[in-house]
Amino acid sequence: MPIFTGSSSDSEDERTIHKTTKLFTRQRSIHSIFGGGKVADILLWREPKIAATLVIGVSILWFLMEVVEYNFITLICHASMTSMLFFFIWSTASDFLNWERPLIPEVVLDESSFKQLARSFHVRFNQILTKLLDVACGRDPPLFFLTTISLYIVSIIGTYFNFVNLLFIGFVSMQTLPVMYEMYEDDVDTAAGKLMRKMKKLYKKVDTNVLSKIPRGTVKNKKFT
């Protein structure tokens, strides 16, 4: 039966209050966690022009679909027709006005960028699944309860938004939270460390006052003949 000693635990927390623990006990930098390539540079705004263009483009797409209430197929068709009309006028006018004809690259979308994005997503998704399974096995009870509460809050928030809005919120979060965390990493790690220590102290109290007092029957070994 676990014994909770408040004074020793408090003194240990006081001694370790200034020791900064990385969020989720990570050992690598945020840039390396996101793959360390161009995708990480965009997410952390080290490529500001590309990141800003991506945010503006996705925001315009969300505005047209959710505010103007454009149908997705209709939006794609209208955008394609507008682009084709623009290039048609440009190509036709260039013969009469001595303009330079539009240059069409052989490769419009780079294959390596897609591979890097897929690889980064695959690695990160596996890390999340591994961490969730590790937490679910009860190896870190405070983190288990914190994760359960967080998932419950997200499930409640999800009932007030449709799928497109959730995707947009997720995209904006991915483009803002990592770079904000990188800017204020020490402050966030310190606050997260304090929160985890409080959660562990709370779990010890619950374990001592509630869980340890629940009667448990002895497990008898069954003999098979």
From Swiss-Prot:
- The residue ranges crossing the membrane are 50-70, 72-92, 152-172
Q: Which is one Gene Ontology cellular component term of this protein? A: endoplasmic reticulum membrane
Chief location of this protein within or outside the cell = endoplasmic reticulum
What topology does it adopt in the membrane? Multi-pass membrane protein
Choose any GO biological process term that the UniProt entry carries and state it: response to bacterium
Output the superkingdom of the source species: Eukaryota
Subcellular location per UniProt equals: Endoplasmic reticulum membrane
**Record domain Reticulon: where:** 39-224
Keyword list, A-Z: Endoplasmic reticulum, Membrane, Transmembrane, Transmembrane helix
What name goes with this protein? Reticulon-like protein B9
